[in-house]
């Protein structure tokens, strides 16, 4: 099978690895891939509620993340796409957030993204596949009490732009910059760090359609950057 055969050519998503696919945007992406005729494979700390192939892994563990990618590719027989939707946060002033919690945000959001993509690249190069990284509007604009999250997501932005230049002509790379969404991401935060009760946030299912759009572009055609935010997004511009 050549790089232009199969799912990429008929504009279906194919075999897609989704990190953080047990909840939120990742879960919505996994279902969107399945509904579009693709085969999602989820990597997460917990099992997804939907019946999709998955493996439990802590993406902060570089070796475990890379090994999980290899097993996923072996089980699916190929990789046509990777979506790095896993993400955590630790809100609060820099001096108040425990160092371990702060560093875990960077380990999962940035280093975990790099570990997964690094392990997936050889498989994606064989299929002219796609990478969609998930940053945030807080990867473009900084807010107080969000040093860990901003550091990780600004890092994802830079990583993705450099990756796109590095793999041009071999792997399609898309940077997704989502605004606020109705997910469990904000659960457990102190009230001052939660969206207001009347906040107008996007549905993850709608944002997942933007991811699907990027995944289904033919080789040589790339959606390099997608910013998908509520029309009243407070963190953008």
Where in this protein do the model-derived segments appear?
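Canonical Rossmann dinucleotide-binding motif of NAD(H)/NADP(H)-dependent dehydrogenases/reductases
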Residues: 3, 7-41
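Substrate-binding pocket helix/loop in short-chain dehydrogenase/reductase
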Residues: 93-94, 101-103
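Residue(s) in the substrate-gating loop at a strand-loop-helix junction
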Residues: 136
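Conserved NAD(P)H cofactor-binding loop of Rossmann-fold oxidoreductase domains
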Residues: 85-90
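The beta1-alpha1 cofactor-binding region of Rossmann-like NAD(H)/NADP(H)-dependent oxidoreductases
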Residues: 57-67, 99
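Active-site helix of classical SDR
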Residues: 117, 152
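C-terminal helical subdomain
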Residues: 169, 175-176, 195-236
